[in-house]
Amino acid sequence: MKPQLIAFKKFLQTEFQAVDFETFRINFNLCLKREQDNIVIYEDDDYDDQPFFFKPMLSDGFFIQTEVIKQLDYLAKVVENPKDSDQQCCQNFYEALIVFISALAITKGINPNRFHQRLVNRFAIHAVY
């Protein structure tokens, strides 16, 4: 896996493990609802086709907390393309986690815009928030 992508994934996993999960879950579900209010969803869209980070976190806390770490690993593997640069892989990873990153920032008590900017500066990605 590309070094910059590994560093980005580990950074998010470490930040996630440092926050109170129940507070994070509430913030994530609120951010997701706000985001979903801005997306067009069709009747024939299948819920199972939605990525993990575009579904509300509703079930057992321990299960979801463990699943988030697994899904971050999985997503990093999915977005890694040998033909893409490190920066492009990180950009794809970032764009798939906009809601997750915003909820993480809110849970940490940081302005989401500042947190996104911090990621832009640290991992050389382009903010889309």
UniProtKB/Swiss-Prot annotation:
This is Uncharacterized protein MG296. Coiled coil: none annotated. InterPro entries: Mg296-like_C, MG296-like_sf, Mg296_protein. Pfam families: Mg296. It comes from the Bacteria. The lineage of its organism: Bacteria, Bacillati, Mycoplasmatota, Mycoplasmoidales, Mycoplasmoidaceae. It comes from Mycoplasma genitalium (strain ATCC 33530 / DSM 19775 / NCTC 10195 / G37) (Mycoplasmoides genitalium).
